[in-house]
Amino acid sequence: MRSATIVSAVLFSAFSAVHLIDDFLSGVPGEFNLTIPITLLLSFAYMLALVGLIVAASCRSPTSYLGLTIAGLLIFLAQLLKSIPEMIRPGSWHLGLPSEIAAIGLGLSAGMTAVCSYLAWRATRHADRRMS
């Protein structure tokens, strides 16, 4: 399950980067009254945390599996509750089809990461119990 976790998390980070760029180009930070420097700082912190969790997961850290589960679940829910309803409204969303592909890819990869990471976390816990 560790390999599936790493692969899905790498996809999650790739779609996150693309979606962040799309959000910048579409003026999303302005919707939340965020300045460009603050938005850049938040983007940096998000990507640093996500990549850090992937690195830790590659070392079989149970805590990183739990962190990726939570991150994946939160982003999956954000896409489901915010982006999908906006996309199904009439008219184009953000920059059209490329934006929609990025948002759907982000949601799916985040969901896959949440599931795979949770299963890896459970497997790690069960292995630890057997060792005790």
Language model features with spans:
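Short hydrophobic alpha-helical membrane-anchoring segments
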Residues: 16, 20-23, 83, 119-122
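Membrane-water interface at the C-terminal end of transmembrane alpha helices
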Residues: 2-4, 55, 106-131
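Hydrophobic alpha-helical membrane segments
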Residues: 66-86
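N-terminal signal-anchor transmembrane alpha-helix
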Residues: 1-30
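Interfacial segments of alpha-helical transmembrane regions
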Residues: 1-11, 61-72
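Structural motif marking the loop-to-transmembrane transition
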Residues: 1-2, 6, 37-40, 63, ...
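Interfacial non-cytosolic loop connecting adjacent transmembrane helices
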Residues: 27-35, 79-104
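Core segments of alpha-helical transmembrane spans in multipass integral membrane proteins
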Residues: 14-18, 23, 35-59, 70-73, ...
